[in-house]
Amino acid sequence: MANAIIEKAKERMTQSHQSLAREFGGIRAGRANASLLDRVHVEYYGVETPLNQIASITIPEARVLLVTPFDKSSLKDIERALNASDIGITPANDGSVIRLVIPALTEETRRDLAKEVKKVGENAKVAVRNIRRDAMDEAKKREKAKEITEDELKTLEKDIQKVTDDAVKHIDDMTANKEKELLEV
């Protein structure tokens, strides 16, 4: 019974970590990374389709992404979607593929992105703390309903806190690594 509360909290915290990793993947660090285009959706035959499902995305050079559509007729739609996206990179269409040259980041841009990383990391920690609160509330509810004893409640609260501390430490590590990656020249 008590383990179910902890397992549910762990699972939700893992989802927070995965979400944070996806968010960090979308923050460009001055080098090509296919995950920059994960959030780009293309209007393809009237349906919003993720870019990676209608084109292959390769990295021929350190700062170049190459988008090769599976269907050449979708090239203009892909270019339109890339222009409309918030990635901040202008696509170059050469008729059969689209090149995205990632510009070198200025010092100011690096600092701004580092601030963004901190903000995203802090939001992830808030989400983890909310998960902890939900788990603690569930444990207290079970103690009130006499499903667990007061001693079991104290042990459970300590276990939940340990899981939370581990999750927050993991988020701090992820944030520090992303900041380091951004601030490297």
Curated annotation (Swiss-Prot):
GO terms for biological process: translational termination. One of its GO terms (cellular component) is cytoplasm. Its main location: cytoplasm. GO terms for molecular function: ribosomal large subunit binding. Keywords: Cytoplasm, Protein biosynthesis. It is found in: Cytoplasm. The keyword Cytoplasm applies. PANTHER family: MITOCHONDRIAL RIBOSOME RECYCLING FACTOR PSEUDO 1, RIBOSOME RECYCLING FACTOR. HAMAP family: RRF. Belongs to the RRF family. Responsible for the release of ribosomes from messenger RNA at the termination of protein biosynthesis. May increase the efficiency of translation by recycling ribosomes from one round of translation to another. This is Ribosome-recycling factor.
